Amino acid sequence: MDAVAAEPVSSSTAGLPAQLRDLGQQNYAPVWRAMQRFTDARGEHTADEVWVVEHAPVFTLGQAGKPEHVLAPGEIPVLQVDRGGQVTYHGPGQLVVYPLLDLRRLKIGVRDYVCKIEQALIDTLEEWNIVAERRDGAPGVYVGGAKIAALGIRVRRGCTFHGLSFNVAMDLEPFHRINPCGYQGLQVTSVLDLGGPSGMDAVKAVLLDQLARQFGLVLQPTSALPDLSLPA
C-alpha cells in the first residue's frame, strides 16, 4: 500500500463524537470477537468508537499471513485473524488502538485512513523529538529503519475495525520468533528504547489527541466495556 499525503484536521474544528473505551489489559480473542460484533451490528447512525487495550502475549496472522513466517512461537499462542497484513506480536507494554470508524461519515477512503493513522503516530513521536517516517509499500511507522508501529486493518461496509499497535515499553524478544510483517530480519524498536517515556499513560494521551486531530473526532471517555464474552 502506497503512502498518501493527508492534511491533519485542525484541533479547533468542531469534531464528530466518538466513544473512547479503555479496556485495560485483555486477551486478544475476546476483543477481536467484540470488534466483529460491533461492526456487524452497527448501522448508519451508530456512533463511532475508539478502543484502547494492552494484550496478553499473542502472535496474530493476518489474511496475507504465511505460517512459515512464525519461526519459533514457543509458549506464545498463534491466532489466524481477519485483518489485513502478515504476522505480528502483541504483548504487555504495547499500546493497541482499534478505531471503529465509519469512513463514509468521515468522507475519506482507505488510503487516507491509513495515512492519517501513520501521521498521528509520527506526530506523537515528535513530542519526544523522535523522528519517524513512513515506508512506501510497507504500512506502519519506522525510526532509523526499525519498525515502531504496525498497522493491520479491515474495512467492512465502509466501517473500520482492527487498527494499530505501538511499541511503547515492552519486551521485544518475541519479535525475534517471527518475520515481523513478513519481512525476514526486520528490526523493531520501542519508544522507551529511543529515549521516550516508559509510562503508557503519557504516550496514550498524546496518541489519542493526535488521532482525534487527524480524524476530526471529539473523544468521549466511557467506563463501560464492550461485551468481551466468547461464543460457546
Curated annotation (Swiss-Prot):
Catalysed conversion reaction: octanoyl-[ACP] + L-lysyl-[protein] = N(6)-octanoyl-L-lysyl-[protein] + holo-[ACP] + H(+)
GO biological process: protein modification process
A GO MF label: lipoyl(octanoyl) transferase activity
Keywords: Acyltransferase, Cytoplasm, Transferase
Cysteines paired by S-S bonds: none
Active-site positions on this chain: 181 (acyl-thioester intermediate)
Site positions for Lowers pKa of active site Cys: 147
Domain BPL/LPL catalytic: 44-219
Enzyme class, broadest EC rank: transferase
InterPro entries: aa-tRNA-synth_II/BPL/LPL (IPR045864), BPL_LPL_catalytic (IPR004143), Octanoyltransferase (IPR000544), Octanoyltransferase_CS (IPR020605)
E.C. number(s) listed in UniProt: 2.3.1.181
Subcellular location: Cytoplasm
Pathway: Protein modification; protein lipoylation via endogenous pathway; protein N(6)-(lipoyl)lysine from octanoyl-[acyl-carrier-protein]: step 1/2
Binding site for substrate: 83-90, 150-152, 163-165
Main location: cytoplasm
GO cellular component terms, A-Z: cytoplasm
Secreted as UniProt keyword: no
Signal sequence extent: none
Any single Pfam family the record assigns to this protein: LplA-B_cat
Function text: Catalyzes the transfer of endogenously produced octanoic acid from octanoyl-acyl-carrier-protein onto the lipoyl domains of lipoate-dependent enzymes. Lipoyl-ACP can also act as a substrate although octanoyl-ACP is likely to be the physiological substrate.
Further remark: In the reaction, the free carboxyl group of octanoic acid is attached via an amide linkage to the epsilon-amino group of a specific lysine residue of lipoyl domains of lipoate-dependent enzymes.
Family indicated by similarity: Belongs to the LipB family.
UniProt protein name: Octanoyltransferase
